[in-house]
Every structure is written in structure tokens, then in C-alpha cells.
UniProtKB/Swiss-Prot annotation:
One of its GO terms (biological process) is photorespiration. Its main location: mitochondrion. The gene is AGT2. Pfam families: Aminotran_3. This is Alanine--glyoxylate aminotransferase 2 homolog 1, mitochondrial. It catalyses: glyoxylate + L-alanine = glycine + pyruvate. Homotetramer. Residues 1-12 form a transit peptide. Transmembrane segments: none annotated. Its EC number is 2.6.1.44. InterPro entries: Aminotrans_3, Aminotrans_3_PPA_site, PyrdxlP-dep_Trfase, PyrdxlP-dep_Trfase_major, PyrdxlP-dep_Trfase_small. The modification N6-(pyridoxal phosphate)lysine is found at K320.
């Protein structure tokens, strides 16, 4: 967090901007953009309501006065978002922006999607809250629909409120089921910021100096920056060796994202999980798939990210896109593993809340009805190919990677050494905002643009984004 705030603060300096621009002119080969004029946001039929609330400055002052100091904001001049519709957001002046980050990969179906709004509203009129000490059909209906999306014997659902909670529960299940404490995760991973999941996370910008015992981090199977390139078998051998030399020989579990989100849209090397799952199970552990960002058809090729590696986990965690913005998460596992929790009381006050359950079920229905997985595959392929074409013209683009609408653009100051272009990324980040495009940033050095929009994002939106990036790089 401290590093991110420092980078954002530095980006506000005119000197810093001039240095970044100078670096680009000196070190990079850039070709002129195809466009002579800045591209325009695609047309969209929606009239935002007149805004009569507090200004951005007033909101910022309240944040500083009443909210925790760990919070940070994007952009030199913070953006005051007051309305959203599908893949677009509106500021206090009524200006429209293309949301290419989906509230940090959370708004899956689109802002204020009518079907989801209707489900939430109708349930709210009847019953807003009742815990699982009573019966209510909404939680059962949602659990049944979610279990139907899972392969194998993954049929028992626990509802929580966030990804951190989901991963916390998954880790507890793994430890109770196996009788071991030792967990394995990947370097560059993000699995949450709670007191336990912060141990699974392996990015120093997110880690406080707290006890994190019995958690091991193995070499990240990163095809772009990893020591073994795209050879999944060599990365898997590191897991085997780590279990042999760095643990008791028996582990509780292994957890991984199929495409690392906060880490910069890093897709794991092909075949990696298939080999690692076998190694971990032979060591007595269970395999956990973190689908908080990759799930629900976002990758296009598959409904779940783990399916891209041809594996079936023992536990699956999910959040973010499951609720389209509602505070909702889930853990899905087998009846055998779930049974270890029956000896005590496990209770979550808001887990399975009727309103969240109704909204979550509506999300599943919208994804199916509107064929969003197929849409992600089609639009994502178009987006990635266009980005790769732009990469050929600009040396600053070191890597374009991802699947469907989960895409990363890594910026480097030297393609051979892959030096993170931190300063230049900050400049382009601001320029894209000025052109009306909101993207995310990720990776340890903050030099990866994270393109993960709502799944209603269109080819026209993709063209606008790519043209804006091309235009911005060409004019630095």
C-alpha cells in the first residue's frame, strides 16, 4: 500500500512527468498512431440523472477526515463517480467513461443491470435479512444453481461476504481435513488482506509485518518473467522440491489463481496445475482454486479458470463477479471435506443473506441468458489481437497476455531486461483517463495495465481502448 501511495504521489509531480516523457523519447522505439485525432468513446443510449450531491473535493475531504489512512485513490485528480450503466461510469459533471476495470473485476454483468436490479429490489420488498437459523428459499435456490455449475463432486456451498473470507475459510477447511498446518501458495499471488490470508498473499505492497507461520511460497510459473519460461513441469518440480526440503513432508493444501489478478494478469504456465495437484495430493494436501477474479465465464474459453488447466480442485473459492457488486463470496467443496466443520458451529451472519442470494442467482441467470462466456471469448480474442498489433509498433509494451476479458499489458523500459516502466505507466494511466478510459494497474511494480471490464464490453469498446492506448503512447 505504501509503495502504491508513493507512486501515485510521485505521479503528481510535473518533474516526474517530464522525466517519464524524456525516458520514452530516449529509450523507446515508437511508431505514429494510426489515428491523427484522439479516438471518441462509442455511442451509448443513456441519460444520467442530474447530480446534486457533494463535489469531488468535498468527498475527498470527508474520506481524509473519517476513513482510514490506508485508503488510496487513483489519479492525480480523484474521480467522483456518481452513476453507472452497463460498461460505463459517469462523473459528477455527467461525463461518461469506459469502465475497463469493472470495480476491480467485480461488476460482471454490467453496472445496474436491469435483471439483477429487479431481483434485488423484489427481494428487498419482501425480506431484507434472515440468517440461516431460519429457512428461506433464496439461499437454497442460489446454492443449487451454483453447485450445478461445478464439476465432479464439488456440491457443498458455504456463503460468505468477500474473497478474503472465502480464502480464510478454505484454508481452515484444508487444515482441519488434513490435520496439517502447512500451506503452499505462489509468489506474486494475492489471496486477501485478512490476518490469515495476508500470509497466502506474496506481494510486499499488501503485507503487514504479522506472524504468517506455516505458509510457503513457491516459484511463480510466469511465462513472461519466470525462470523456466513456459515450462510448467520445471515449475512443478520446484513445488515437489519445496515439499521435500521446506516442509514436514505433509501439507494441508495448495492455493493458486489460474490467472493472477492483482499480480498483473499472469496466466500460469501450461500444464502446471495438473502436475502440481498430483504432487500436493501425494503429500496429503488438498488443492484450492481461487476463482475470485477468473470465474463465471470471464476467461471466455471456460466457465472456471481452473478448467483451462484441465484440473478439478478439492475446494473452490469465489467472490467479486459472483454478485455483480453485492458483498458476496462463496466456498464450494466436496461433502467429505465439508464434513470436518460439522463438529463445531460455523456461522456467518450475512452469508446467504436473502437479498445477496437473490442477486447472485440473477447473476448466474444473466450470464447464461446473455451468453456472456461466449461473448468474452469473442470480444477478448479481438481485444488481445489488436493489442498485439499495437505491441509491434511500440517497444514499451513488453507483454500482452490473458484470456477472454481478463487481460494484462505489461510496460517495460527495456524489452531485453524487462525493466518495469513505472514512471511511464503512471503517465499513460492519466492520459487514458483524460481520453475517457478507466483501467486498473497491477503487478509488484505497478507497471501492468489490468483490462478486466464488465462482460458486456463490446468490440467497439475494445477498439476505442486500443486506439486510445496507441494514440497516447505515440504522443509521449
Amino acid at each position: 500500500m505504501a509503495l502504491q501511495r508513493q507512486l501515485l504521489k510521485r505521479a503528481t509531480s510535473d518533474i516526474y512527468h517530464r522525466r517519464a516523457i524524456s525516458l520514452l523519447r530516449t529509450d523507446f522505439s515508437t511508431s505514429p498512431s494510426i489515428a491523427d485525432a484522439p479516438p471518441h468513446i462509442p455511442p451509448f443510449v443513456h441519460q444520467p440523472r442530474p447530480y446534486k450531491g457533494p463535489s469531488a473535493d468535498e468527498v475527498l475531504q470527508k474520506r481524509k477526515k473519517f476513513l482510514g489512512p490506508s485508503l488510496f485513490h487513483y489519479y492525480q485528480k480523484p474521480l467522483n463517480i456518481v452513476e453507472g450503466k452497463m460498461q460505463y461510469l459517469y462523473d459528477e459533471s455527467g461525463r461518461r467513461y469506459l469502465d475497463a476495470f469493472a470495480g476491480i473485476v467485480t461488476v460482471s454483468c454490467g453496472h445496474c443491470h436491469p435483471d439483477i436490479l429487479n431481483a434485488i429490489t423484489e427481494q428487498s420488498k419482501l425480506l431484507q435479512h434472515a440468517t440461516t437459523i431460519y429457512l428461506h428459499h433464496a439461499i437454497g435456490d442460489f446454492a443449487e444453481a451454483l453447485a450445478a455449475k461445478m464439476p465432479g463432486n464439488l456440491k457443498v456451498v458455504y456463503f460468505v461476504n468477500s474473497g478474503s473470507e472465502a480464502n480464510e475459510l478454505a484454508m481452515m477447511m484444508a487444515r482441519l481435513y488434513t490435520g496439517s498446518l502447512e500451506m503452499i501458495s505462489l509468489r506474486n499471488a494475492y489471496h486477501g488482506g485478512s490476518s490469515n490470508t495476508i500470509g497466502l498473499t506474496a506481494l510486499n505492497t499488501w503485507k503487514y509485518p504479522l506472524p504468517q507461520g506455516e505458509i510457503h511460497h513457491v516459484v511463480n510459473p510466469d511465462p513472461y518473467r519466470g525462470v523456466f519460461g513456459s515450462d510448467g513441469s520445471l515449475y512443478a518440480k520446484d513445488v515437489h522440491d519445496h515439499i521435500e526440503y521446506g516442509t514436514s513432508g505433509k501439507v494441508a493444501g495448495f492455493i493458486a489463481e489460474t490467472i493472477q489478478g492483482v499480480g498483473g494478469a499472469v496466466e500460469l504456465a501450461p500444464g502446471y496445475l495438473k502436475s502440481v495437484y498430483e504432487i500436493v495430493r501425494n503429500a496429503g494436501g488438498v488443492c484450492i482454486a481461487d476463482e475470485v477474479q477468473t470465474g463465471f465465464g470471464r476467461t471466455g474459453s471456460h466457465y472456471w479458470g481452473f478448467q483451462t488447466q484441465d484440473v478439478v480442485p478439492d475446494i473452490v473459492t469465489m467472490a467479486k463477479g459472483i454478485g455483480n457488486g453485492l458483498p458476496l463470496g462463496a466456498v464450494v467443496t466436496t461433502p467429505e471435506i465439508a464434513s470436518v466443520l460439522a463438529s463445531k458451529i460455523l456461522f456467518n451472519t450475512f452469508g446467504g443473506n436473502p437479498v445477496c442470494s437473490a442477486g447472485g442467482l440473477a447473476v448466474l441467470n444473466v450470464i447464461d441468458k446473455e451468453k456472456r462466456q461466449e461473448h468474452c471469448a469473442e470480444v477478448g480474442s479481438h481485444l488481445i489481437q489488436r493489442l498485439k498489433d499495437v505491441q509491434k509498433r511500440h517497444d514499451i509494451i513488453g507483454d500482452v497476455r490473458g484470456r477472454g476479458l481478463m487481460v494484462g499489458i505489461e510496460l517495460v523500459s527495456d524489452r531485453k531486461d524487462k525493466t518495469p516502466a513505472k514512471a511511464e505507466t503512471s503517465v499513460l494511466f492519466e492520459q487514458l483517463r483524460e481520453l475517457g478510459i478507466l483501467v486498473g494497474k497491477g503487478g509488484l511494480h505497478g507497471n501492468v495495465f489490468r483490462i478486466k471490464p464488465p462482460m458486456c464490453f463490446t468490440k467497439d469498446d475494445a477498439d476505442f481502448l486500443v486506439d486510445a492506448l496507441d494514440y497516447s503512447i505515440s504522443r509521449l
